[in-house]
């Protein structure tokens, strides 16, 4: 009996310790856990979207999982990045105050998760994704207003490496320029004939402020896409829309040479005082850059992807 017990124990121990001695187990990864649908008592579409935004990360943060070069909290890189992009798309569907509260709450959860294990790579990996999607000028979902609460947190967090603090502080200052709902900074510009105009002097229900350069491929793409809007010329002639293409660099010969390429019913000019860059009136990180302003020159969309600007105008002016 004792002999059988010893043999059984040895078999059990062998099963538990099977494999090469001391060999670490492979990391266990998971799919991104989508939030539960809104409860049945949440009936309005806007309320259901807000619910999804507010609970988007609940299941994700509820788990303890590995963060390494291949995954963030157990979710592989491609999956977590796609999920973050989905989250940002949802933020665009809720009021700005709801969106910025959500990103502020998300940053607090990021810090809390890192505090559970100070040696984890989680904070570093997740904040890299945040910056890539919300602040990179080439990101199709970039949004400085969404990013501001997070980058302010990153600038002050004990989990941020000291060498990154000045960069985050600078980004926070830049993102605070001309926020959603504020009146943008006014400036003067000259047209091709040397006449001086001002941004505030433009009269239209909506103004597209388009920082562009001559011979810029991406600028030409935006010009073509705007021109392809069926009702664009009618919107401009009726005063519903003005398009102001402003050149902010110093190669004026190129700008003058390129003038025939701009639509005749657009407002074109150059910053003859060079104050937009030198005084940093706007955070123009890359050309092209698009702002959409209301009649009072308040910000509706800031450094926005062209698709967002076009969709907004089509929605607001389609029946005009």
Regions found by a protein language model. Give the residues of each.
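Short active-site neighborhood of thiol/selenol oxidoreductases, capturing the structured segment around
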Residues: 197-227, 242-244
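Structural microenvironment flanking redox-active thiols in thiol-disulfide oxidoreductases
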Residues: 223-260, 274-279
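Short, internal strand/loop/helix patches
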Residues: 259-291, 295-296
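Non-catalytic, surface beta->alpha helical segment in thiol-disulfide oxidoreductase systems
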Residues: 286-289, 295-320
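Positively charged n-region of N-terminal signal peptides that target proteins for export
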Residues: 1-5
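C-terminal motif of bacterial Sec signal peptides marking the signal peptidase cleavage site
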Residues: 14-17
